[in-house]
Amino acid sequence: MKSIYILLLLIAVTCMTACNKMDENGALDGNWQLTEWRTATGDSIIATNHTRKIYYTVKYDILKFQDMLDASNYHCLAYFRHQADTLVVERAFSQPFDDVIPLDSLANYGCPANGRYLIRRLTHEHLVLSSDLGVLTFRKF
């Protein structure tokens, strides 16, 4: 009986010491669909979810940019930093070949050449980013 107790205790301790990296992004973590892209002044619409199918996926320190209407089905991955109300894209890679690309290559996804976004709104359901390229509104799905 004592050996069963020790075995159960060892199993419990092993289960509690998993090696998974913990998420540090809070509400930012997840899949985001672009619903509206407006100019920086807000006077005209550049794209909506009806004209473009742009998605951002956030996990750990990776940001994935994807346009589902792009027939080539390529996407880009980038490392990013999230601090308070700022999101900064640092290094970007083109998939499927993992080529390093300049940040201005991400302009079609709404990413500015300097990679810096201001987070205007962030909840578990909505995200609003602004930059010199415009204001991007997303919904979580």
Regions found by a protein language model. Name each.
Residues I4-V13:
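Sec-dependent N-terminal signal peptides
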Residues R52:
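An amphipathic, hydrophobic-aromatic interaction surface with interspersed Lys/Arg
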